Curated annotation (Swiss-Prot):
Post-translational modification Phosphoserine, affected residues: 79
Pfam families documented for this protein: NLE (PF08154), WD40 (PF00400)
Organism: Homo sapiens
Function of the protein: Plays a role in regulating Notch activity. Plays a role in regulating the expression of CDKN1A and several members of the Wnt pathway, probably via its effects on Notch activity. Required during embryogenesis for inner mass cell survival.
Name used for this protein in its record: Notchless protein homolog 1
Localization annotation: Nucleus, Nucleolus
Amino acid sequence: MAAAVPDEAVARDVQRLLVQFQDEGGQLLGSPFDVPVDITPDRLQLVCNALLAQEDPLPLAFFVHDAEIVSSLGKTLESQAVETEKVLDIIYQPQAIFRVRAVTRCTSSLEGHSEAVISVAFSPTGKYLASGSGDTTVRFWDLSTETPHFTCKGHRHWVLSISWSPDGRKLASGCKNGQILLWDPSTGKQVGRTLAGHSKWITGLSWEPLHANPECRYVASSSKDGSVRIWDTTAGRCERILTGHTQSVTCLRWGGDGLLYSASQDRTIKVWRAHDGVLCRTLQGHGHWVNTMALSTDYALRTGAFEPAEASVNPQDLQGSLQELKERALSRYNLVRGQGPERLVSGSDDFTLFLWSPAEDKKPLTRMTGHQALINQVLFSPDSRIVASASFDKSIKLWDGRTGKYLASLRGHVAAVYQIAWSADSRLLVSGSSDSTLKVWDVKAQKLAMDLPGHADEVYAVDWSPDGQRVASGGKDKCLRIWRR
C-alpha cells in the first residue's frame, strides 16, 4: 500500500495553477507557466509587463471568465466553477496610463442665459466650452477665468443641438426652426452662411471624422422632418439628402469607417455610405422609438488628434500640419477600433438596448434588458469596454461593451437621469438628473464617488472635458456650473 501523502503536500500541490496570458483579441502572450493560487494583480502585472517587454510598464487589469481579479486569483476563482486541472486563461487589459480625479466642488456658477441651458459641450482639447439655450443663443465661456466669453446671436428659436468639429475650430448649432449655424470660438462670430433646408427642428449634428477629412469640411444633421442632410460647410450648401426614414430622425453618428448611422422614431436604425448616400442596411428590432445611440469609437472620433494622456494644465489648440493631425487621429481611432469594425449600441422607448455590429450584420449581437423606463442616453466608455445607459427609471446601468452582458446598476438619483459623461480614463462617470443634482460614480467599484448638489432645478446637460480637468452642467435654472476636483 502506498504511503499516505502528507496533507500539507496535498494542500501545497493545490496551491499552484498553470496559467496562460491572452490579450482581449485572444492573442497568446508567452507560454503557460505556473503561479501560486494566491497571486495578486500587482504580481501578475510584473510578470505580464516583463513578457510584453514594454519600455514603460503598462497599468493592466486581469480577468478570468469575465470576472476581474481584484484581490487574488484564488478569490476570483472561488466565485466560479472553474476546472483548475486545465491551463487557465488570464485575459490582460491595458488601462489608461493617466488618471482623472473626481470633481468635488463647483468653482463657478455662470449666469448669462435667460432661458434653460439645453446643451453643454467642451471642445476636443478642453480649451473651450460652449452652451446652447432656449434663449436662442449659443455662448462660449472662457475656461481660464471661468467667465462668459462670447454670446452668439443668429438663431431665431431654441438651440437644441451643438457639436464641435473634431479639430476644435468650429462649432455647429441647430435650432427648433431647422437652421444650422457655424461659429468660430476664438471670435464668437458666425462662419460662412446659415445652412437652411430642414423643414422641422434639428435633432442631431455629427462631423465627418478628422482622420477622413482633416479640414473638417463636412457635417451631417438629423431632423424631426425625417431626413438626414450632409453639408459642405466651406461652400455653405447641402451636398446630399438621405431619405428613407418614415418618422423623425432622433440621432445621428458619423462613424470612422465611412458609414453614417441614423436612428428614428420609426423604430429603425439606418446605415448609410457617407460618400454617396447609399443605404447599406436597416437595423430592426426595437419595439418603439429609438431615442439614442452610441459608437464604440465615439470618444476617439470626438477628440480626433488630441490624446488626453498628454493634456497640459492649460488646454491649447492642436498643433501640427493637417497631415500630422490626420495621422494622429487615425492611429487613435484604430487603437480603439481594434480588430473588428466599430460597434453600435441603441436605446429605446421600449426600455431596451441593442448592441450591433452594423458594418457586418443587420441582426443585433444582443438585446440588453433591465431598465424599467425609457432610455435617455447611452455611451461607450472612451476605451469602449463598458456601455453606460441613463434612464427615466432613475438608474444608470453598466454593460459589457463587447458582449452586452449586464454588469451593474448605479442607484442614488431620486428622479430621471437625463445625461451622462465619461472621464477620459474610463474610470469615472458623471450624471445629471431631474432631481437637480450631479453625481460622480466610480465605475470599477460600482458606487457613488461624489454627490454634487448646487443647481436649483433639473439638470439637462452635462459634459466632462477631454483633458479631465472640469465637468460642466446646465439646466432649467439657466445657470452653467463648472465643477473641479
